[in-house]
Amino acid sequence: MLTLMALTAIVGFLILKNKPGRWWFVAIAELALICRFIFVFVIYANGTEYSGTDGLLYHQIAKDIAIQLQSGTPLWKVRYEYTWYTVLTGIQYAIFGVNRYAASFVNAFFSVLSGYFLTGTALNLGFSVKKSRLIGIVYLFIPSMIVWTTDTRKESMIFFLIILIWYMTLRVIRQRDWSISRQCLYILTICLLLWLSTLLRIYMLYTFGGGLFICLLFCFLKTKRNMIFVFLSAVLITCCIVSFTTVRHNMRDYHALTMDRSTEGDENLDEEIDSILNTIMSKNIPNSINGFLTKPHLEEVPFIPDIAGNPFAITVVRIEMILWYICMIVSVFGIMYALIKWDPYLLGLLAFIVSYGLINALISENVADTYYRYRAAIVAPLLLFADYRPFFAKIKDLLMTASPDAKSGDNSIML
């Protein structure tokens, strides 16, 4: 724990280098990390081999992977189920020993790093230091961010990759004075992260691919920079390669999709994909989208398995849901401002949010806690839009610009 706390401080000072107030922000981040450590001990109060749902399942698989690695099985031949996150945890178990507490502490560490990179993204977008710090602090202390990122679940890594990819993308777009080699290194790293995100959650390739395509296309049309075109081409090539390799290979084993796995071959896979599409078309799309954005409703919160029977946790989640509804309303104005401003980066980020939400609304089971967990991935991107002031300031500027002409017209009539 002390090692992770030290690393948290070091990374915080590096990301927020030369930024005012970085000392107390890092202190708050350390507090957020400690809160997660405490929560780990709470959720494992009944033992690490009996607590949790998906987290317990991944823990059991990771132990088997550790045995494979220790017996000499090469990493690329390791047998795993559900998600590549179990392999990452298995590697940790193989090196340091089976310790679910340690695995959860690492997840908590990556969760806090996500808060740093989110704050850095806000600063690079030109937000004020105060606003950027507020976004990061809110993200660090949102209850769902604590709940879903401290167990041995894959959510912590997914949230981290989402924020890191968009952070690095913004850096490539904004830092025009970088050397070509440094820009290429960032682009190659982003492409690698796209592949890793696909291994963690199979459809992430397309949510990222769509968002980055919109972002980079409009950025290229606006700036005509050759490196942006190279970046766009690299993303498209990565999406094609990963689609025909990783996605195609793992589609049949993707546990969130209902498939007949007794058959093999491309023709049967095509039939299964057609079945999935038919299932999507049979859904009430408006109701599914509404469920993804708004569930769990306040009356459904007590029935979430992870917090059922815990009055304090139920109250906290209800408060969070009310704040989430407010955040969505406020974000509408931020989104309208982004559309008026026509900023390529914000448009791409918005495309990512929309595509991720739509995919999950259509393929996720209509269960409140499932929507609650999957929706947590778009909390960080949406926080970057959660400000009504720029929109109304823009409207005010437009009115002020038009008023002199109107006043001049009135005077001419009077004369």
Give a label for each model feature.
Residues V11-K17, F105-G126, I329-F333:
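Transmembrane-helix motifs of polytopic, lipid-linked glycan transferases
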Residues T83, V87, F96-L113, V317-M321:
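Loop-to-helix entry region of an early transmembrane alpha helix in multi-pass inner-membrane enzymes
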Residues T8-F13, H297, F303-D306, N310-D343:
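Hydrophobic, aromatic-rich transmembrane alpha-helices
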Residues N46-I61, G72-L88, G97-V98, E300, ...:
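Extracytoplasmic catalytic/substrate-binding loops of multi-pass membrane glycan-assembly enzymes
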Residues T150-S156:
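Short acidic/glycine- and proline-prone juxtamembrane loop motifs at membrane-interface regions
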Residues L118-F141:
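Transmembrane-helix signature of polytopic, membrane-embedded enzymes
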Residues N18-K19, N124, Q175-L185, T223-M227, ...:
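Membrane-interface helix-loop-helix junctions at transmembrane boundaries of multi-pass membrane enzymes
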Residues W195-M321:
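Alpha-helical transmembrane segments and terminal signal-anchor/GPI-anchor hydrophobic tails
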